């Protein structure tokens, strides 16, 4: 797991997300607390539960982006899910326990990658020997294997193989044949049963090998994977992955405001209040049965987020509100924020368009007043129509660059300066006309 300090986490998030310091600090503290908890004595560690977070803010201000970036920093099992995808147990749709099953699958993948790294050297050696055996088959006579391995010819070929001189040469090798996939049609909500049936049928088949002809470079990669998988103990892998989920797992619940109960609705609300009730045991702590084993959710961190434009946090059922003790409000974006978004983040929008046009040999230069005008145009459209936050910049930029993108292949070697006048000529009519803005921007 990540050992970054809160300050380092915020600094890393700053290079991708503008503003929203409160939200960044909250997730940074929550992530660091995971590390702090693991430094405690075992009996005290069991008592320290994560403080789940609820992020509240309008659409397009960075809630989901914080989750995406956090996933890369966490170095722990992480899953982002939409709360609207789930329904109450017994109805058509995904059950909330699928969240933990998916989280466990991601932990299995993470753990396998770590174990492959540890045994990569041994796997590379074994793969190298198999390729040399294919290149230099041993004579049928019962020669001493050590003498054969150390022969001058074998060492010459080993040197050439390591230097990449044999990469394009084709060889025939025996590789594990992929198990035939068995597709089982099942109704929504029955995914777990389907997975168990599929794994049962696949395990019934013998582990056959197949002879294939391929370049040495491709064969080497394939054999490394095959040899590494032989060195990994599958039972240990599952145990480590489950431990990783239970102690370090993070679940990001997006669009949680969409499962708030509507005041005017009547009858069962299977995709709203029912889902909230089903989420309660997960967030509070329960045991979920997965195909890899039983997973306890007591110490999994839940971060929920929602725009809450049509509802408010108090519309969530009280029990769920109590399980999300830390509330963070994200600020709406201003024209100044838009300007910073266009220039400051790593791989900003302006950098992306400069690089894209550069592939056609076209040079683009954004002036200071040009960027100001783009930011102002996006902010104005958000104020007059629906406020979709920073996503409006994508729409405005695409409209601004449309003509240039279309003609770029015919303008190789040209230089285009995007200043306030260029932006005004391209966008002014659309920004001023509210009806056009509604449909085009």
Curated annotation (Swiss-Prot):
GO MF annotation list: ATP binding; ATP hydrolysis activity; peptidase activity; proteasome-activating activity
Main location: cytoplasm
Statement: the UniProt record of this protein carries the keyword Mitochondrion: no
Location relative to the cell: Cytoplasm
Role of this protein: ATPase subunit of a proteasome-like degradation complex; this subunit has chaperone activity. The binding of ATP and its subsequent hydrolysis by HslU are essential for unfolding of protein substrates subsequently hydrolyzed by HslV. HslU recognizes the N-terminal part of its protein substrates and unfolds these before they are guided to HslV for hydrolysis.
NCBIfam families: hslU, PRK05201.1
Protein's name according to its UniProt entry: ATP-dependent protease ATPase subunit HslU
Gene name of the encoded protein: hslU
């Amino acid at each position: 797991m990540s050992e970054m300090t809160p300050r380092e986490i915020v600094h890393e998030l700053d290079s991708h997300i503008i503003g929203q310091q409160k939200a960044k600090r909250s997730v940074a503290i929550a992530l660091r607390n995971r590390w702090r908890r693991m430094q405690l004595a075992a009996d005290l560690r069991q008592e320290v539960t994560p403080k789940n977070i609820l992020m509240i803010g309008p659409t397009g201000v960075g809630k989901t982006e914080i989750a995406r970036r956090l996933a890369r920093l966490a170095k722990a099992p992480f899953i982002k899910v939409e709360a609207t995808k789930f329904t109450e147990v017994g109805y058509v749709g995904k059950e909330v326990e699928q969240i933990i099953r998916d989280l466990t699958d991601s932990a299995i993948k993470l753990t396998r990658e770590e174990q492959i790294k540890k045994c990569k050297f041994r796997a590379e050696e074994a793969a190298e020997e198999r390729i040399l055996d294919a290149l230099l088959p041993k004579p049928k006579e019962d020669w001493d294997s050590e003498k054969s391995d150390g022969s001058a010819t074998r060492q010459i070929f080993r040197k050439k193989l390591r230097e990449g001189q044999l990469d394009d040469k084709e060889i025939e090798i025996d590789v594990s044949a992929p198990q035939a996939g068995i597709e089982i049609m099942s109704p929504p909500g029955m995914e777990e049963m389907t997975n168990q049936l599929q794994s049962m049928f696949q395990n019934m088949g013998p582990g056959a090998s197949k002879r294939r002809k391929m370049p040495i470079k491709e064969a080497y990669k394939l054999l490394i994977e095959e040899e590494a998988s032989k060195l990994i103990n599958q039972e240990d892998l599952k145990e480590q992955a489950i431990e990783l989920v239970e102690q370090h797992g993070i679940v990001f619940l997006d669009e949680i405001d969409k499962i708030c109960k509507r005041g005017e609705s009547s009858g069962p609300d299977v995709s709203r209040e029912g889902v909230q009730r089903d989420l309660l045991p997960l967030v509070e702590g329960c045991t979920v049965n997965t195909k890899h084993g039983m997973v306890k959710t007591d110490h999994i961190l839940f971060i929920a987020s929602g725009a809450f434009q049509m509802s408010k946090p108090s519309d969530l059922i009280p029990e769920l509100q109590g399980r999300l003790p830390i509330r963070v409000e994200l600020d709406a974006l201003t024209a100044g924020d838009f300007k910073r978004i266009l220039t400051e983040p790593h791989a900003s929008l302006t950098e992306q368009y400069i690089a894209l046009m550069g592939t056609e040999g076209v040079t683009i230069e954004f002036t200071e007043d040009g960027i100001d005008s783009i930011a102002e145009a996006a902010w104005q459209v958000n104020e007059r129509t629906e406020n979709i936050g920073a996503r409006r910049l994508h729409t405005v930029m695409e409209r601004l660059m449309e003509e240039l993108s279309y003609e770029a292949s015919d303008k190789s070697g040209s230089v285009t300066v995007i200043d306030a006048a260029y932006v005004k000529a391209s966008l002014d009519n659309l920004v001023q006309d509210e009806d056009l803005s509604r449909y085009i921007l």
